[in-house]
């Protein structure tokens, strides 16, 4: 028998009546960790399958006989000279047929390294039909691996087997069985790297069932399952935290608010969204890592908001946004931790986490709506005293809240629940509105407060108007008086100047007040006077000589 280098022959044996013999050709060698799994096909009486010497078995050769099995005596022998290395398993399979049924290989048959033999067997009830389709790939040094599919009476199945065996690898058969009820499809595939071990991955999809992870009731009673996008978490009543071993356990509450840096803020109000699940996972993981050395129990997210409920400052980064998550961290009932120690540990962890920006500690009494008293510091919300105006509606609920009205009040309609003097609750209008025509309407100008009874704005408007008018009148009087005073002063000065220049005569110098009527400056006469003003020039006053 001639085989390609490193190949292993897979004899096919058929048992006959009364004695069936399975023979392996001497000299056959099975390599380490190689599994030889012969495949037997049941045939009708007097059916012989023969391969002549020198015949080359090509891929996709199909032999499909039909047979009825009887009960014979099967014997399997190995011819001397067969060598099985350590770890080699030879598992011949014998199928009983009627007498005179033999299948053998003639020496000299050559099997190509890339020949494919993929037997596929289908069994039905009550009539059995066996069909074989050679399609197994035998690379050098490899061994064939059959893939078997069994279909049970009820339902239908479709399978697509695919096995890849590179040189030097060992094959691992993959078998898929469909269930009797329903319809399913499975696709199996085995990939073996050179010289490595096989790794199989099976992906199955079912047409029945739902994607809701809470349908299987994974949480122990009395905890409830809260569904996220494709996961869930278990939630207990207030004051309790969920423990996988014992369900809900009574604990100690430490409320607070944490600022988280996120890339996307859409749908954070929807617990079934992808973004909320991502945020929930980040917050829970942060606190689990922070309190891993304590008796920490669970973190419960109360609310997610873009605005902080405990700080007026908000932080915006270039590529990310900040959301504020109201949380409650649960510890053991007898924990040694207090509010200060818990807040200190969280603030230290914030410094080393890039996704967490800050932590705000919330007072436990404010969280429950109780009055601070004693050293217990509202450790038990059911026993604390409610603040004025708040009351505990249910004795089993630790929160103190404002009482509600018997009739519904809507903030959209500008309504709120008010408490009368007799303690009864009534739905009334908000401040700045009053009830008119069966609904809350805005107060007219100048009125405000409850039922528009506050007239402060109207009084302030009237007083302001009067004061403004009085100030304006004073300003006008002041301007008029100043202008009249300035005008009177200018007239007196002008009269004095005119009188002074009118009476002024400058005879020796020839100046006279010729400009007094139209100008304040005097004019000078440039003409030669007809008579000299020098007394010595007067000849009539001086005697003349006689000669």
Swiss-Prot record:
Every EGF-like domain range: 210-249, 361-401, 401-441
Residue ranges crossing the lipid bilayer per the database entry: 459-479
Keywords on record: Cell membrane, Disulfide bond, EGF-like domain, Glycoprotein, Membrane, Repeat, Secreted, Signal, Transmembrane, Transmembrane helix
PANTHER family: HEART DEVELOPMENT PROTEIN WITH EGF-LIKE DOMAINS 1, MUCIN-13
BP-aspect Gene Ontology terms: maintenance of gastrointestinal epithelium
Lineage: Eukaryota, Metazoa, Chordata, Craniata, Vertebrata
One GO CC term, this protein: apical plasma membrane
S-S bonds: 214-225, 219-234, 236-248, 365-378, 370-384, 386-400, 409-427, 429-440
Chain segments annotated as coiled-coil in the UniProt record: none
Source organism per UniProt: Rattus norvegicus
Carbohydrate attachment residues: 243-244, 263
Gene Ontology molecular functions: protein homodimerization activity
Topology of this chain in the membrane: Single-pass type I membrane protein
PROSITE patterns given in the database record: EGF_2 (PS01186), EGF_3 (PS50026), SEA (PS50024)
Main location (coarse class): membrane
Name of the protein described by the UniProt record: Mucin-13
Sequence ranges assigned to domain SEA in this UniProt record: 250-366
Compositionally biased region (Low complexity): 1-210
PTM section of the record: Cleaved into two subunits, alpha and beta, probably between the first EGF domain and the SEA domain. Beta subunit contains the cytoplasmic tail and alpha subunit the extracellular tail. The homooligomerization into dimers is dependent on intrachain disulfide bonds. Highly glycosylated.
Subunit structure: Homodimer of beta subunits.
Region ranges (Disordered): 1-218, 525-547
UniProt function note: Epithelial and hemopoietic transmembrane mucin that may play a role in cell signaling.
Places the protein is found: Cell membrane; Secreted
Cytoplasmic side: 480-547
């Amino acid at each position: 028998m001639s085989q390609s280098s490193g190949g292993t022959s897979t004899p096919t044996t058929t048992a006959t009546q009364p004695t069936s013999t399975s023979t392996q050709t001497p000299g056959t060698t099975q390599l380490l960790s190689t599994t030889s799994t012969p495949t037997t096909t049941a045939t009708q009486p007097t059916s012989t399958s023969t391969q002549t010497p020198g015949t080359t078995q090509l891929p996709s050769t199909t032999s499909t006989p039909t047979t009825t099995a009887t009960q014979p005596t099967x014997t399997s022998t190995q011819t001397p000279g067969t060598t099985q290395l350590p770890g080699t398993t030879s598992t011949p399979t014998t199928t009983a047929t009627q007498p005179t049924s033999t299948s053998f290989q003639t020496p000299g048959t050559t099997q190509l390294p890339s020949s494919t033999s993929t037997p596929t067997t289908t069994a039905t009830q009550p009539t059995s039909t066996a069909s074989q389709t050679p399609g197994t790939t035998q690379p050098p040094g490899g061994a064939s691996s059959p893939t078997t599919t069994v279909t049970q009476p009820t339902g239908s199945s479709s399978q697509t087997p695919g096995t890849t065996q590179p040189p030097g690898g060992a094959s691992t058969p993959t078998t898929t069985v469909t269930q009797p009820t329903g319809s399913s499809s499975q696709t199996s595939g085995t990939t073996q790297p050179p010289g490595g071990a096989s790794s199989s991955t099976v992906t199955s999809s079912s047409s029945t069932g739902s994607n809701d992870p809470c349908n299987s009731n994974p949480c122990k009673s009395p905890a409830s399952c809260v569904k996220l996008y494709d996961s869930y978490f278990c939630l207990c009543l207030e004051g309790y935290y969920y423990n996988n071993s014992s369900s809900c356990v009574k604990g100690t509450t430490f409320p607070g608010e944490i600022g988280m840096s996120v890339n996307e803020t859409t749908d954070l109000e929807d617990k079934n969204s992808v973004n909320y699940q991502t945020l929930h996972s980040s917050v829970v993981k942060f606190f689990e890592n922070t309190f891993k050395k304590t008796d920490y129990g669970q973190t419960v997210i109360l609310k997610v908001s873009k605005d902080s409920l405990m700080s007026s400052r908000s932080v915006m980064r270039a590529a990310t946004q900040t959301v504020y998550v109201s949380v409650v961290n649960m510890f053991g009932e007898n924990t040694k931790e207090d509010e200060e120690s818990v807040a200190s540990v969280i603030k230290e962890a914030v410094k080393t986490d890039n996704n967490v920006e800050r932590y705000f500690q919330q007072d436990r009494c404010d969280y429950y709506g109780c009055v601070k008293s004693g050293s217990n510091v509202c450790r038990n919300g059911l026993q604390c005293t409610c603040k004025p105006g708040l009351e505990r509606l249910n004795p089993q609920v630790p929160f103190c809240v404002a009482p509600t009205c018997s009739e519904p009040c809507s903030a959209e309609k500008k309504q709120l629940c008010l408490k009368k003097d007799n303690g009864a609750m009534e739905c009334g209008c908000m401040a700045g509105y009053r009830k008119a025509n069966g609904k809350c309407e805005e107060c007219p100008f100048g009125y405000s407060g409850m039922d528009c009874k506050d007239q402060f704005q109207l009084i302030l408007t009237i007083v302001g108007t009067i004061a403004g008018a009085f100030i304006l009148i004073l300003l006008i009087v002041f301007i008029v008086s100043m202008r009249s005073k300035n005008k009177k002063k200018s007239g007196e000065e002008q009269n004095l100047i005119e009188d002074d220049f009118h009476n002024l005569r400058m005879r020796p110098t020839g100046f006279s007040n010729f400009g007094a009527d139209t100008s304040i400056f005097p004019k000078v006469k440039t003409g030669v006077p007809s008579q000299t003003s020098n007394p010595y020039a007067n000849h009539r006053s001086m005697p003349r000589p006689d000669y």
